């Protein structure tokens, strides 16, 4: 089965966002700056310090991101990043870290299937943090 990896777009703050996610989730972060990339001469000069491509890899997941020209970026609520945790402690800890500076839309609480919490992080990305019952 193929892997499904989220690719996030940002309005000039990809480096800050991906660094924040690394602090929350751990893993290895790689960043490619527009001005140091093979396509640098094809990009407008004002984008030279923006992120062309980034990747955050942990043992269990990988997600990527880049900056986008502000006039082309569309924010919406049709997609959530869902973290499935192994314990209640991990669920609450990751929820608290990701919610820092953002908006806690639904605190972690118990449902028939386990725990769930929903938040919008300080970069406008929507997350669900869950822990299923065994």
PLM region descriptions:
Residues 1-110, 118-134:
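Glyoxalase I/VOC metalloenzyme domain signal
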Residues 113:
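Substrate-binding/gating loop at the entrance of the active-site cleft, primarily
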């Amino acid at each position: 089965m193929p892997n499904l990896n989220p690719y996030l777009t940002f309005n000039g703050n990809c480096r800050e966002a991906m660094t924040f996610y690394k602090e929350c989730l751990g893993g290895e972060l790689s960043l490619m700056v527009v001005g140091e990339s093979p396509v640098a001469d094809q990009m407008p000069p004002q984008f030279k310090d923006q992120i062309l491509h980034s990747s955050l890899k942990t043992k269990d997941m990988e997600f990527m991101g880049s900056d986008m020209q502000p006039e082309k970026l569309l924010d919406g609520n049709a997609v959530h990043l869902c973290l499935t945790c192994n314990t209640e402690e991990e669920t609450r800890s990751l929820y608290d870290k990701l919610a820092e500076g953002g908006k806690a839309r639904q605190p972690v609480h118990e449902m028939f299937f386990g725990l769930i919490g929903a938040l919008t992080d300080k970069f406008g990305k929507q997350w669900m943090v869950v822990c299923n019952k065994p």
